[in-house]
């Protein structure tokens, strides 16, 4: 574990840490289309949630796991988070604004009483990490805002949305209210992943 960062996890294609490997920092995720992950190393301050294609979810704390195939034979999604959090809402952001580059805008998501996460349009998923709530299936409200990255940094959307973790099936869902900005849409991609799109400015 000496070469593994405290906030880093490494997933491997073969058992006993062999074959191709991928490094994950806390707040990131890996979507494995082939289902071919067989072992992993988890940093001291990390927690890794892994879903199998059959819906099974397993959490791994800091340590080495040379063979995960008995519990997760066909890995689907790998989510790396800080150890003090329970789950992550994985969000990617894009836009449909004509004449603008894919990465012209920035989405900020701020969960209630937590630090915000900034997500540039056109990129991969970023994790909005959520602690365990009481009760565990409580909703948490998140403030969202979208602005252009270039000067003058004009704001084009402001609003809020609710997310909820369901322990019985280890999935994250969302609920829109009147606070959701009308020029945006959100689509649920999988058990923890969502795409937010800025439709117009």
UniProtKB/Swiss-Prot annotation:
Keyword RNA-binding listed: no
Gene3D superfamilies: Calcium-dependent cell adhesion molecule-1
Induction statement: Expression is controlled by rpkA.
A GO molecular function held by the record: calcium ion binding
InterPro entries: CAD_C_sf, Dictyostelium_CAD, Membrane-bd
Main location, first listed in the record: membrane
Subcellular location per the Swiss-Prot or TrEMBL entry: Cell membrane
Protein's UniProt keywords contain Ion transport: no
One of the Pfam families matching this protein, by short name: Membrane_bind
GO annotation terms (biological process): calcium-dependent cell-cell adhesion via plasma membrane cell adhesion molecules
Protein family membership: Belongs to the Dictyostelium CAD family.
Function: Mediates calcium-dependent cell-cell adhesion during the early stage of development.
Protein name as annotated: Putative calcium-dependent cell adhesion molecule 2
């Amino acid at each position: 574990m000496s070469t593994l960062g405290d906030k880093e996890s490494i997933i491997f294609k073969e058992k006993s840490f062999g074959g191709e490997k991928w490094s994950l920092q806390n707040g990131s995720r890996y979507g494995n289309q082939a289902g071919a992950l067989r072992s992993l190393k988890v940093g001291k301050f990390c927690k890794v949630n892994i879903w199998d294609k059959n819906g099974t979810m397993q959490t791994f704390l800091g340590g080495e796991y040379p063979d995960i195939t008995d519990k997760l034979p066909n890995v689907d999604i790998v989510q790396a988070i800080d150890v003090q959090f329970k789950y992550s809402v994985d969000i990617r952001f894009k836009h449909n604004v004509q004449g603008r580059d894919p990465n012209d805008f920035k989405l900020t998501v701020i969960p209630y009483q937590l630090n915000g996460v900034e997500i540039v349009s056109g990129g991969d998923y970023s994790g909005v990490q959520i602690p365990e709530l009481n009760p565990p299936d409580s909703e948490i409200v998140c403030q969202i805002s979208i602005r252009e990255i270039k000067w003058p940094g004009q704001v084009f959307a402001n609003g809020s949305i609710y997310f909820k973790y369901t322990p019985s099936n280890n999935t994250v869902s969302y609920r829109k209210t009147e606070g959701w900005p009308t020029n945006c849409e959100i689509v649920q991609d999988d058990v923890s992943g969502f795409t937010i799109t800025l439709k117009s400015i």
